[in-house]
Amino acid sequence: MISVTELRNGTKVEMDGGLWECLDYSHLKMGRGGAKVVTKFRNMETGSIVDRTFNSGEKLQDIYVEGKKMQYLYKDGADFMFMDMDTFEQVILPPSLVGDAAKFMKENTEVEVAMYGEKALTITLPNQVILKIVETDPGVRGDTVSGGTKPAKLETGAVVQVPLFVEQDTNVKVDTRTGQYLSRA
């Protein structure tokens, strides 16, 4: 159990029957009344965000979330198959858990999966991945004062904006957090 005054950004707790991550907190001291802690939490299972206010003496149950290195193997229908890099055990994760990360995952991509007990909570991709462009229009140099861009479809199906000089079948480095082109690889 931790006191609400010990909450920090990224602290993970169990409350209201769910697993929550603290996104923001502030400690407010009223003139005559007791201090209050105003927080913002994100549900780690559904992604919903709530604001909560606690009195300074309240306690919450903290949880330990373990990060496991896993490797994406393949897509099986709608589900995604991962392998634990330590035990070589295979785990099936639903598309609701993988979310937008699927746009930048190709086979054999190593990811970090946040686990609470035996339950997977979130997937974290590497900050940058190298993917191949499978479809893009030829770059037409026209009236562009500064560098123009064009859409390019990657091998995973994601579409990113790339500079005009980038051609089809080129490997590019993409930022997985923003989905933006970084450079040729």
UniProtKB/Swiss-Prot annotation:
Annotated signal peptide: none
Listed pathway(s): Protein biosynthesis; polypeptide chain elongation
GO biological process, one term: peptide biosynthetic process
Record localization: Cytoplasm
Keyword Protein biosynthesis applies: yes
GO molecular function, one term: translation elongation factor activity
Top-rank taxon, per record: Bacteria
Predominant location: cytoplasm
SUPFAM superfamilies: Nucleic acid-binding proteins, Translation proteins SH3-like domain
Keywords annotated in UniProt: Cytoplasm, Elongation factor, Protein biosynthesis
Tagged with keyword Protein biosynthesis: yes
One Pfam family this sequence matches: EFP
Gene Ontology CC: one annotated term: cytoplasm
InterPro entries to which the protein is assigned, alphabetical: Elong-fact-P_C, NA-bd_OB-fold, Rib_uL2_dom2, Transl_elong_fac_P/YeiP, Transl_elong_KOW-like, Transl_elong_P/YeiP_cen, Transl_elong_P/YeiP_CS, Transl_elongation_fac_P
HAMAP family in UniProt: EF_P
Function: Involved in peptide bond synthesis. Stimulates efficient translation and peptide-bond synthesis on native or reconstituted 70S ribosomes in vitro. Probably functions indirectly by altering the affinity of the ribosome for aminoacyl-tRNA, thus increasing their reactivity as acceptors for peptidyl transferase.
PANTHER family in the cross-refs: ELONGATION FACTOR P, ELONGATION FACTOR P (EF-P) FAMILY PROTEIN
Family: Belongs to the elongation factor P family.
Protein name: Elongation factor P
The species this protein was found in: Deinococcus deserti (strain DSM 17065 / CIP 109153 / LMG 22923 / VCD115)
Gene behind the chain: efp
